[in-house]
Every structure is written in structure tokens, then in C-alpha cells.
Regions:
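N-terminal secretory signal peptides
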Residues: 1-29, 44, 52
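A ligand-binding cleft/hinge motif common to bilobed small-molecule-binding domains
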Residues: 115-118, 251, 257-274
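Extracytoplasmic ligand-binding site segments that recognize negatively charged/polar headgroups
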Residues: 67, 87, 91, 110-251
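Early extracytoplasmic/lumenal segment of secretory-pathway proteins
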Residues: 54-118
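Periplasmic-binding protein-like
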Residues: 223-232, 271-295
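A bilobed periplasmic-binding-protein/Venus flytrap-type ligand-binding module shared by bacterial periplasmic
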Residues: 165-172, 207-211, 287-300, 318-321
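Conserved C-terminal helix/tail region of periplasmic/extracytoplasmic solute-binding proteins
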Residues: 248, 351-384
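Mature extracytoplasmic/periplasmic domains
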Residues: 294-358
Length: 384
């Protein structure tokens, strides 16, 4: 098994496209060449902009926000300049940057919601007024997403999400072939399975395969069974790599199956590559990003205005089909604004029954209490 690179949140690591470079034009060029933006650094020009907080907002975000036209409407309508830094590290690193930087360095960040409860507990992010945001336009299940609420108070809002299930080459496999994770263990696909190097989604999906409805809340026996499943899967896996490595390998025909979802498949399919994705009968796990405001920002008014924009339909309809990677979006008005083919590709065609049909078999990705043991099991799997 080839392990190319440790990758902390694969749906947004190492796929960031610089719109000012020759790789910024199309996703097809990205697949052909690969792309990565380095982890954020606090440059002097960025720090100097903090002084003009009354007319600006400082944002640390994962990829997509930097693409042309994403933030233009916000800046033109509000007169607020967005000082944007794209983050290519982990959620923990993003939150630590907000926590350890001087107040106002970052007014807004966009971590995975699984990290919001600890950020609330540590006093890093500010409480939000639900009435300030278009939650009535959201899918109900996302508006009430448990990790962003605590004791009836709102601290963050999901504005981008998706799922992990199976991404597959539909010229080689039918939908019925991949309706169960059993396909990953079929001897005929030995060495043809690729995995993204991030333990939570891979182990979460395999935990669902083992029959655990709450895939990250396992007792000792269930966790032992999960390790057995990992051991069984190991000979089937030919590649563990970062996002660009896996996508390029699949696009080149080297691999046919991956534990992944629309954030990988939709863009490749749109570019004419033969990949589809689905949630197997055993279920899958979600990924998401949630916007939140620093508890120490001196610039909360502008930060809230920014959150209002990125939770609204105009922005989300663009973010859904960002060149960086596609995603589902929770604002139903944004879904309606998408072309019909994009809505179908992103499972947003039937928005009235989205909660009860599509989301019913997905479990929120979370950080398990015995996280270190999970990480150790994943490292052992990779090195076997």
C-alpha cells in the first residue's frame, strides 16, 4: 500500500486553487497538474490592516472563498473590505490561530463543526443571535445542527457540507454493485481502492459498516471490531494520500473506488470523468464547515455582517460549485438558484424532503473521546 502524505482534513486540504495562477482556470487543469497553497502565515501587510477594523473584516477560511466573484457583492454592498487568508492546515491549527493571535487578527474562522463544542467550552468563539441569520431558509436539520448550539445558544452556523460514502467508477461498477461497503472487500478490487489520509471519515464509515448507528461512540468491543475491519481492508487499499494525489490517481484510471462523496466526485463528473458517488445502505458520515466569530474581536459588527452574507443564498449558490471543490449548501434558496444539473449532482433536487430522505442515513462526523487510540489505529493501518 502506498502512503503518500498525511492529510488532516481532506475535503479542503491541498486542493486550493490560486485564482491568479495558470491553474485557476478549470478543475481539469487542477487534476492534471495538482495544486497546493501553503499553510497560512501572518504577513506584515495583513497585520497592518487590522488597524482599519471599522471598514474591514479579517477572515481565516478554507478554500473557495478566494475564488473570483465570491466576496465582491459583500464588499460592494457593505463597503467592508475582506482581508482573507486561506488556511491549508487542520481545524485544530485554525482554532489555535484565532485563540493565540492578538484580538482582531482573525474576526471570523470556518472550522468543521465537530470542533465547535470545545471552542465554546474554551471561550474562543462568540455567541450569535439566531435572529440575525436566515436560519428559516435552511434545511431544518442543518439549522438545528447540534455541535453549533449549546444550552439553546447559537455559536456557529454551517454554510457548507457534504458526505462520505463511496465514490466509484460507474463504467466498471453499477449502483447496485456499490450499494454496500462490501464492495471494498471484494477480492476483484484488491489494490484498486484509494483512501484519503484522514482517519475520522474512513474509520467512521467503516464503523457504520460494522453496524454502529453512532459510529464514533464505541465501547471497547466495538472499537476492537473496527480495528479488525481495518486489518481486513488493508490489502484492498493501494493508495493513501492527500486530496490532490487521490483525485489525480483516480482521474488517471489507477483506482476505481474511494471512501468519499460529492466534494470529490461531483467536480470530476462535471469534467467528464466516469465517477459517481452514493451513500451505501449501511450509511455514511458528514463533513461540514461552520462560520463563527472570535470572542475577543473588536470588530463584531462587521464579522456578523460577513456571516449574514455567507449564510445567504447569493454566496452559497457560488460556493456550492466552487472550483476548489463542490459541496452541498444548507440554504434552500441557494439550492434553487443552482442549475438543475448541478442540483441533481449535489443531491439538492428534492429540497422539501432532503432532511428525511438524504440526511436520514448520515451521521455527523465528530471527534471520539478516545481520539488518540483512533489515530494510533489509523497510523498502524497505514504502516502495515
Amino acid at each position: 500500500m502506498e502512503t503518500l502524505m498525511n492529510n488532516d482534513n481532506p475535503q479542503y486540504k491541498n486542493v486550493l486553487i490560486n485564482p491568479n495562477s495558470q491553474l485557476g482556470g478549470t478543475r481539469r487543469k487542477f487534476i492534471a497538474h495538482g495544486a497546493a497553497i501553503g499553510a497560512v502565515s501572518l504577513s506584515a501587510p495583513f497585520i497592518s490592516k487590522i488597524a482599519s477594523a471599522s471598514t474591514s473584516v479579517n477572515v481565516l477560511a478554507f478554500g473557495g472563498y478566494e475564488e473570483p466573484g465570491m466576496l465582491t457583492e459583500f464588499e460592494e454592498k457593505t463597503g467592508i473590505t475582506v482581508n482573507l487568508k486561506i488556511h491549508d492546515g487542520s481545524d485544530e491549527e485554525m482554532i489555535a490561530l484565532m485563540e493565540t493571535s492578538s484580538p482582531g487578527t482573525f474576526d471570523v474562522i470556518t472550522p468543521t463543526s465537530a470542533y465547535i463544542p470545545k471552542a465554546i467550552e474554551d471561550g474562543i468563539i462568540a455567541e450569535l443571535n439566531p435572529a440575525d441569520f436566515p436560519l428559516d431558509d435552511y434545511f431544518d436539520i442543518i439549522a438545528k445542527w447540534p455541535p453549533v448550539w449549546k444550552t439553546g445558544k447559537l455559536y456557529a452556523i454551517v454554510n457548507r457540507f457534504g458526505y462520505y460514502g463511496i465514490t466509484y467508477n460507474h463504467k466498471k461498477f453499477s449502483e447496485s454493485d456499490v450499494s454496500s461497503y462490501d464492495i471494498l472487500f471484494d477480492p476483484s478490487v484488491k489494490g484498486r481502492v484509494a483512501l484519503f489520509d484522514w482517519f475520522l471519515p474512513n474509520m467512521g464509515c467503516l464503523s457504520k459498516y460494522n453496524g454502529n448507528p453512532n459510529p464514533y461512540d464505541l465501547d471497547a468491543a466495538a472499537f476492537s471490531d473496527l480495528n479488525d475491519t481495518l486489518t481486513k481492508l488493508r490489502p484492498q487499499v493501494g493508495l493513501v494520500g492527500n486530496t490532490s494525489q487521490v483525485i489525480q490517481a483516480m482521474a488517471g484510471g489507477s483506482y476505481d473506488l474511494a471512501i468519499a462523496g460529492e466534494w470529490v466526485q461531483a467536480g470530476m463528473y462535471d469534467d467528464g470523468l466516469p465517477f459517481k458517488a452514493l451513500v451505501p445502505e449501511q450509511g455514511g458520515v458528514t463533513w461540514d464547515q461552520a462560520v463563527c466569530v472570535s470572542a475577543t474581536t473588536p470588530n463584531k459588527e462587521n464579522a456578523v455582517k460577513f456571516l449574514q452574507y455567507v449564510t445567504g443564498p447569493a454566496f452559497q449558490s457560488k460556493l456550492a460549485i466552487a472550483k476548489t471543490y463542490y459541496s452541498m449548501v444548507p440554504n434552500k434558496k441557494a439550492a434553487v438558484m443552482l442549475p438543475n444539473d448541478k442540483r441533481e449532482l449535489l443531491n439538492l433536487s428534492n429540497i422539501e424532503k432532503f432532511d428525511e430522505i438524504f440526511m436520514s442515513n448520515l451521521s455527523p462526523r465528530k471527534s471520539p473521546d478516545n481520539r488518540d487510540e483512533w489515530m494510533a489505529s489509523w497510523e498502524q493501518f497505514k504502516n502495515a
